[in-house]
């Protein structure tokens, strides 16, 4: 009975780890998708050098 209980606990731990890992991976995929849709830092640097663009996007440009 001891071996059967240990095997059951092992399966429970493996299943729990797999489910948690799968859900975490799904969340990170959404974060990656959001990040890939955003403008890169280099593009914001170019925008911040242009006064009209800087005026329209002040939240992305540091104060000078």
Swiss-Prot record:
Compartments where found: Secreted
Keywords: Acetylcholine receptor inhibiting toxin, Disulfide bond, Ion channel impairing toxin, Neurotoxin, Postsynaptic neurotoxin, Secreted, Signal, Toxin
Any matching Pfam family: Toxin_8
Annotated propeptide span(s): 22-41
GO function terms (MF aspect): acetylcholine receptor inhibitor activity; ion channel regulator activity; toxin activity
Disulfide feature: 47-53, 48-61
Residue numbers spanned by region Lacks the Ser-Xaa-Pro motif that is crucial for potent interaction with nAChR: 49-51
InterPro entries per UniProt: Conotoxin_a-typ
Signal peptide as annotated in the record: 1-21
GO cellular component: extracellular region; host cell postsynaptic membrane
Expressed in which tissues: Expressed by the venom duct.
Entry annotated with the keyword Disulfide bond: yes
Coiled-coil residue windows: none
Domain topic, free-text comment: The cysteine framework is I (CC-C-C). Alpha4/7 pattern.
Family: Belongs to the conotoxin A superfamily.
Function: Alpha-conotoxins act on postsynaptic membranes, they bind to the nicotinic acetylcholine receptors (nAChR) and thus inhibit them. Has possibly a distinct nAChR binding mode from other alpha-conotoxins, due to a different three residue motif (lacks the Ser-Xaa-Pro motif).
The protein, known as: Alpha-conotoxin-like Lp1.7
Species the sequence originates in: Conus leopardus (Leopard cone)
Organism classification: Eukaryota, Metazoa, Spiralia, Lophotrochozoa, Mollusca
